[in-house]
Amino acid sequence: MFLIIFILPTTLAVIGDFNCTNSFINDYNKTIPRISEDVVDVSLGLGTYYVLNRVYLNTTLLFTGYFPKSGANFRDLALKGSKYLSTLWYKPPFLSDFNNGIFSKVKNTKLYVNNTLYSEFSTIVIGSVFVNTSYTIVVQPHNGILEITACQYTMCEYPHTVCKSKGSIRNESWHIDSSEPLCLFKKNFTYNVSADWLYFHFYQERGVFYAYYADVGMPTTFLFSLYLGTILSHYYVMPLTCKAISSNTDNETLEYWVTPLSRRQYLLNFDEHGVITNAVDCSSSFLSEIQCKTQSFAPNTGVYDLSGFTVKPVATVYRRIPNLPDCDIDNWLNNVSVPSPLNWERRIFSNCNFNLSTLLRLVHVDSFSCNNLDKSKIFGSCFNSITVDKFAIPNRRRDDLQLGSSGFLQSSNYKIDISSSSCQLYYSLPLVNVTINNFNPSSWNRRYGFGSFNVSSYDVVYSDHCFSVNSDFCPCADPSVVNSCVKSKPLSAICPAGTKYRHCDLDTTLYVNNWCRCSCLPDPISTYSPNTCPQKKVVVGIGEHCPGLGINEEKCGTQLNHSSCSCSPDAFLGWSFDSCISNNRCNIFSNFIFNGINSGTTCSNDLLYSNTEVSTGVCVNYDLYGITGQGIFKEVSAAYYNNWQNLLYDSNGNIIGFKDFLTNKTYTILPCYSGRVSAAFYQNSSSPALLYRNLKCSYVLNNISFISQPFYFDSYLGCVLNAVNLTSYSVSSCDLRMGSGFCIDYALPSSRRKRRGISSPYRFVTFEPFNVSFVNDSVETVGGLFEIQIPTNFTIAGHEEFIQTSSPKVTIDCSAFVCSNYAACHDLLSEYGTFCDNINSILNEVNDLLDITQLQVANALMQGVTLSSNLNTNLHSDVDNIDFKSLLGCLGSQCGSSSRSLLEDLLFNKVKLSDVGFVEAYNNCTGGSEIRDLLCVQSFNGIKVLPPILSETQISGYTTAATVAAMFPPWSAAAGVPFSLNVQYRINGLGVTMDVLNKNQKLIANAFNKALLSIQNGFTATNSALAKIQSVVNANAQALNSLLQQLFNKFGAISSSLQEILSRLDNLEAQVQIDRLINGRLTALNAYVSQQLSDITLIKAGASRAIEKVNECVKSQSPRINFCGNGNHILSLVQNAPYGLLFIHFSYKPTSFKTVLVSPGLCLSGDRGIAPKQGYFIKQNDSWMFTGSSYYYPEPISDKNVVFMNSCSVNFTKAPFIYLNNSIPNLSDFEAEFSLWFKNHTSIAPNLTFNSHINATFLDLYYEMNVIQESIKSLNSSFINLKEIGTYEMYVKWPWYIWLLIVILFIIFLMILFFICCCTGCGSACFSKCHNCCDEYGGHNDFVIKASHDD
């Protein structure tokens, strides 16, 4: 239970809730705690502790910690009894607020029994509600042993301890627990039983409890520290009952002196042994503040400015709107109807009061934590309104509610705003009183037939995916479109008017015509085409419900064409459910969003006070509807408040006005005085004299905190305290100068009391540092005689001076500079408010100042000044005629242009040819000359070829040749030859190209067939792999079930480990790192802007100085020495320079001097004085002469070089010395401060309640493997067998005239052969051998000439 986190009011605190005993209890003893006569004296280290148990040697240290107030009183809380206990001992003032902590001074009562020394003193208890739901710290002595425990005790209602030395009539009884209580800390420490006093220092800071202890010496040493994470609110000292202890015997009395601690700054002094020998509470007195400012226990004499004693509010103005109703938040939280995360509910509470303590007590709280808000600050605060959201928690999705989580609950149901000031409440309701309201808030879901979720009574519905649609969305297809579908025909129906039907197209495949292809297939969660699906996945925003669940459009509509569109219940996708029941209670989440902190009338009345009167004219503390501060109320007449407004703010968000609802009066709120207080301190005195500058003593006495002083009065400078008014008395020397000719004079008390009987050693007197002296009776010096040097010789010198008057203007994109394009950084940067706007505003002001400065300089230069140019000096050289073109590179539109322009691309067509090896050679041959067409005929495998593409010029040429050949045969027949060759060669080119394409087709077919074989093998391997995966996964699932059973008993340890991991891997770590980077960059940017402001100040000062020098040096001759150059000014020139002006000064500079005696004036006859005019009176050879101040030239004194005076007196006024504070701020130890902050950074651990019904599901991949096997068979049946294209071999035949010539030649050959055979002797011999073959020649008729043509 986290109720104990909050500080409970004193009136609600009780000691324990278990009545251990009722015997011998009464309410007769009305003792109240004694108040000590001694006060806290920290000068010897009382109340201090050694800082983090560290050692410091021979040093003085300023340290801020939890200390008692110097001069505070102690209260004795020791209670002693014998037989009876009083009920009043367990109520205030004995039951006290712990607040920051306490310092205890405990008497060690020593009793001797049977020659044995016993140590007795009371036990102290520190806790909050003192029951077993919170931790209680108990420090109990056991005769030399300190037993210190921090446990969840069940404290008795009337607890007490008994005397160990002599026994007691009663039995010790201070807690009772049925079992051993849960303890965070349990340890024993020893202490010195012989010590007279024991000192304890207990305090808490940011959830950590610290304990310090000492039994020798008064500074305490570190004992232990313990992180509780809660606030300890109360403490009390348990009564000690004993037979022997008597209040009448000093050595047997009990004393337990306690004083509260507060966060204060102390000055500590450590000696050479590291022991604290002296201490000062910096805010306890005026002297202590001076000691802390100087970090010295013996400050030097001087005047110091103080700040710690400026304001003392004398009253409190508290205002709340009366009679507001109760918000009744608890009634709404305990309502039996609980919504699901899908339809979470919201309620806004305003203009009412709520009691957070009561609220958390009336609901069964599991945890309560806050984000961007200290939950302890809710008590007593007011808000504009409180927004409360709630819903039941599905058990398996509890982790989704962690801040920054992206689980289903926050991505698709309810988004927690981590940037708002909010608190998260986890609570539960009894099972019998809960009704889960599972409702779909989506209107477009309900339009198309969404009914109920059909889940059990305690199941909570939540969305896994959210979808948004346009207002004209309809999930049904158009009947007129899908009626023509042959395959994959979807359901259809009539959509409502104004909506669009589901998009469906008729498509044609290789085997099926009119195949329907519709959108959002197979469903909107896993659609193939998310861009065309009208259902878009979305993430819920802050304050938004899920727009709608997904709809499987395949299940929307009917087979009837004229029915209205509706969807079946199983068409709605993307939702889940789980039970909210745990331990017979339903777990519920509620988010409190606090709007307008300290700016409204929705107030917590946990610490409610009564409305008070408005005190005017004095400094008061105020609490106006939760807004706190200090100020002075002054009644005014104001008509600018509306009836719903009651506070007036300035542009910086500070409250400056107030309208009282009770009296209808209006007030302006002025700040309390926080001005300058000067303390005049004389070394080794006991206190300083004070000067409240510009304040009347009447205001000081009513509003300013100070030690009562009998001496105060109003002076010209302000109210003076602890000094005597003696302004009629003057002194010539003063160590404590207050300014304006006044001084604080100090005299030792002993001598002053004898002469005047004045108790204060300080006097407020007039300061007159000099008296007039005379040299002789006739002519006397006025103001003294001095020795100076006057120039006697000069030389002309030149001097160059540059003054910057402007600079380049700077503008910065602050957001881009810090974050670039990182969205998370931009989101976090927005929380820094108007920082970036202020940066740009400052830079704009800087730029405006630059403009104004430039204008002022220009105006000064335009009036009677000629700018000099081309001045060659020893500091400058001409920079004319420098050529920068080589640095600029290529400029203009011609850079990077190619030989082909865009115009050429538009005017000419580009033709790309498939080249099998001769087109490139042809182009290289022609070189762009089309007339070389036939000259560049290429040979490809022995065949003459040309590219099959002709340009317009080539077509015209060949056509003309063919036409001429046909018109004038036979003379022009030769003109047709080029045309014929051109056609034939290009046909050859097409032929060889087709041959290559045929070969490529074969290669493609072979490669594709090989790919199909590879795919087939791959699917086969995949099927085998899936089979293996199935066996391995099932084996792992079996092992996982066994492992979960083994981890069941040890799950608590795992949860603890996860908590430790979460503490290191917190979701906020990324934001912390981003915030560090932003802080670093903002610091750099702020430093840069600060430098810009500093620079513009210098530039503005430089511009003013430049204008002054233009007016005094350039336009005229300056009488000032070393202002226009070095020496006496002669002439100055000015020239423009980058970002400024260059001055060239000419002056004459002294080279030699003469030492003379001079006097500021002379007194003649003792009653009339003269003073020199633009020179000096010098004493030369016992006579007085006059000389100029810039050149030694003595001349007689005359009425032309003197000024006459009525008297010879001199009035002296001297400015006071102001001592600047040169002390270096003392920062606390970095590691200690870091540990204090870091240990409070905690994370909410996820709910890791073990579900014993977890079962690892075995995978069944049989169906998937069958599908893959079928795919393999289908691929096998789709093997491509490309038909090979036949190749035709063409033989080129000879022309007909060649064949005719061959026949003629053959006949001639036969005739010659016949002649030889028949007409010569050789032929007769042959005939004889042929056996009359010639005779048979003409009768043979079977000779056949066979010709074979394969074509």
UniProtKB/Swiss-Prot annotation:
Residues 1317-1351 are cytoplasmic. Residues 13-1295 are extracellular. Specific enzymatic cleavages in vivo yield mature proteins. The precursor is processed into S1 and S2 by host cell furin or another cellular protease to yield the mature S1 and S2 proteins. Additionally, a second cleavage leads to the release of a fusion peptide after viral attachment to host cell receptor. The cytoplasmic Cys-rich domain is palmitoylated. Spike glycoprotein is digested within host endosomes. It comes from Human coronavirus HKU1 (isolate N2) (HCoV-HKU1). Belongs to the betacoronaviruses spike protein family. The chain crosses the membrane at residues 1296-1316. It is a single-pass type I membrane protein. PROSITE patterns: BCOV_S1_CTD, BCOV_S1_NTD, COV_S2_HR1, COV_S2_HR2. This is Spike glycoprotein. Disulfide bonds join C20-C156, C151-C183, C163-C242, C282-C292, C327-C352, C370-C423, C382-C603, C925-C936. Residues 1030-1074, 1257-1285 form a coiled coil. Keywords: Coiled coil, Disulfide bond, Fusion of virus membrane with host endosomal membrane, Fusion of virus membrane with host membrane, Glycoprotein, Host cell membrane, Host membrane, Host-virus interaction, Lipoprotein, Membrane, Palmitate, Signal, Transmembrane, Transmembrane helix, Viral attachment to host cell, Viral envelope protein, Viral penetration into host cytoplasm, Virion, Virulence, Virus entry into host cell. InterPro entries: bCoV_S1_N (IPR032500), BETA_CORONA_SPIKE (IPR042578), CoV_S1_C (IPR043607), S2_sf_CoV (IPR043473), Spike_N_sf (IPR043002), Spike_S1_NTD_MHV-like (IPR044339), Spike_S1_RBD_bCoV (IPR018548), Spike_S1_RBD_CoV_HKU1-like (IPR044375). The record marks R756, G757, R900, S901 as: Cleavage. Residues 920-940 are annotated as: Fusion peptide 2. Residues 14-294 form the BetaCoV S1-NTD domain. Homotrimer; each monomer consists of a S1 and a S2 subunit. The resulting peplomers protrude from the virus surface as spikes. Residues 1245-1284 are annotated as: Heptad repeat 2. GO terms for cellular component: host cell endoplasmic reticulum-Golgi intermediate compartment membrane; host cell plasma membrane; membrane; viral envelope; virion membrane.
